[in-house]
Amino acid sequence: FAKDIKKQFTYVTKLYNEEMYVIASKSVRGMSDLNGKKVSVDLPNGGTFVTAAIVFERLGIKPNFLYLEQRIAMEKMRAGEIDAVIAVGGKPYKSVSAFNDDRFHLVPVDYAKPLQTDYLPATLTSKDYPNLIPEGGRVDTIAVPAVLAAYNWAPNTERYRKLSQFVDAFFTKFPTFQNPPFHPKWKEVSLSAPLPDWQRLPVAEQWLTTHNVEAVSPARCDEFLKQSPATA
């Protein structure tokens, strides 16, 4: 992948955090138990695939990855053909909420030091997933901060003009996304939240300034990001 990604891409806004789910039989007590096991990480090159590959590599765990669509993977896990299914998405995540089989549970993902540079700590509770967590229980996991990014097109190009139109439409209609029937995760998003070491798309920055959207300080943003996975 490009070495100078921060020069080739800009960001429009930070989005919400997406939690990581590891579903396996109750005999699997921790991530290390999946070493050498058959683990489905969804289809190649998607968000779940990328996150799972990075997390297992950093933890020094080497499962046998399988690339299956979530519904098929869960059926195979029920049948005993694979050992675990990984999913990444904002809670409540539909495929995880819909999985009902008391032989399985959510495996904890500890916030180990190798994960702390790129991920955030998160907590799942029985209120989030009563089908996989006993009443009153909680399971620690990690969360992936999602970002709406765009290629750094030159301002005088047609692509940049289309990006400008998209930003205006997206930002203008954004309050609608924070209400039903849209996903509750949209309520976590602050359009003005900064992304350290990244440049915001100039037209997005201009829109926020023109519409007097208050900037969020880096310290306040960091505090919000650390808290939001556990409280959303």
Where are these regions (language model features)?
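Pocket-lining segment of extracytoplasmic ligand-binding domains
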Residues: 1, 62-158
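Acidic, polar ligand-binding/catalytic clefts
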Residues: 1-18, 90-93
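Extracytoplasmic
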Residues: 6-9, 17-19, 34-36, 77, ...
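Short secondary-structure boundary/capping segments
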Residues: 11-14, 31, 139
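Bilobed "Venus flytrap"/periplasmic-binding protein-like clamshell domains
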Residues: 17-79
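Ligand-binding clefts/hinges and TM-proximal coupling segments of bilobed small-molecule sensing domains
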Residues: 47-55, 122-196
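An extracytoplasmic/periplasmic, membrane-proximal ligand-sensing/linker region
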Residues: 72, 78, 89-102, 106, ...
